[in-house]
Amino acid sequence: MNQKQQKPTLSGQRFKTRKRDEKERFDPTQFQDCIIQGLTETGTDLEAVAKFLDASGAKLDYRRYAETLFDILVAGGMLAPGGTLADDMTRTDVCVFAAQEDLETMQAFAQVFNKLIRRYKYLEKGFEDEVKKLLLFLKGFSESERNKLAMLTGILLANGTLNASILNSLYNENLVKEGVSAAFAVKLFKSWINEKDINAVAVSLRKVNMDNRLMELFPANKQSVEHFSKYFTEAGLKELSEYVRNQQTIGARKELQKELQEQMSRGDPFKDIILYVKEEMKKNNISEQTVIAIIWSSVMSTVEWNKKEELVAEQAIKHLKQYSPLLAAFTTQGQSELTLLLKIQEYCYDNIHFMKAFQKIVVLFYKAEVLSEEPILKWYKDAHLAKGKSVFLEQMKKFVEWLKNAEEESESEAEEGD
């Protein structure tokens, strides 16, 4: 029987750390002193600052002391809770807060942060946490310091260094109550929109579900589109005011459609539904054209349609006849009638079983006084969509001829009467 071979042991062995993995071990104060000394030596040349930070990452433990590093770059030294600089600490003037308060200077500082975070990717999370903390400390900073931080944050949001989720800190109750959040947001959005445009800002906000929360920058008693619009328009941010107004309208439309469908499924009386819709139109400044499109969509979604083409037309006529009084209440303008016609055309084209039902629906609505002859003739002549155009125009040909003849007859009767 073979004896088991003795395995070699590792006791007494020493492994050398590769030189590039060695980091000098400091406490936060020593780390701060090293960074501040280096920044003082580079002076205000931000290119030299970026090079110094790049090289220092090989020797200093950025991962451990990320918060200290960013405190120094923004405020000039380590921040105490609340945002004040500790009196007994060393500080530097090579930082955001000591720089000039203008967009060009903040763009140059943004480049320093970009280069640093691109070089040391692991600092990304630490930097986001730092900005969230700084936003909570806003009351501890001077107005000028807030302005610089706002401009810098806007630029970093625009170039993707920061994620828009950091804006959550601005919804802090005390900051909102004292008007700090709204004032900060003005400077931030100005620099963000200056770098990109309102569409890019909207995309970033939507990604983090913040596109409908901007009114929360104000206390509850001031959270209205009117107040938001006035405040930001006067501050020179009309495009942001319009964006929020549009968001509010989109939200109101969705809410209107949802409530309409619930009312219809409950079988609420039309007079109650009409009253509710008119109130919503007034409250949210929604046009009749928008409303008729919502009602059409809601009416068509309340029923399970037959899959057989020969049966669906009859089912549609029966269903729509029932809802004609509701539709008629919101086609008081020619433009609303035309909108409805286009929605019917679109629906019949998108749902192939309805292709042959188009003309029957239009005739029903004409008889029920939902649609009148002028918008129908306009639709036929030049206001129709390209979708299924040849099929629908052919279907409507005889009815349109009848309408034209009826119109001519009524005109000649009027002339005879004169």
Swiss-Prot record:
Disulfide bonds: none
Residue segments, region Disordered: 1-25
Composition-biased stretches (Polar residues): 1-14
Coiled-coil ranges (or none): none
GO biological process: regulation of translational initiation
InterPro entries per UniProt: ARM-type_fold, eIF5-mimic_regulator, W2_BZW1/2, W2_domain
Keyword Transcription: yes
Cellular-component GO terms for this entry: cytoplasm
Keywords: Activator, Transcription, Transcription regulation, Translation regulation
Domain W2: 246-413
Entry's family note: Belongs to the BZW family.
Role noted for this protein: Translation initiation regulator which may repress repeat-associated non-AUG (RAN) initiated translation probably by acting as a competitive inhibitor of eukaryotic translation initiation factor 5 (EIF5) function. Enhances histone H4 gene transcription but does not seem to bind DNA directly.
Protein name: eIF5-mimic protein 2
Organism of derivation: Gallus gallus (Chicken)
Organism phylogeny: Eukaryota, Metazoa, Chordata, Craniata, Vertebrata
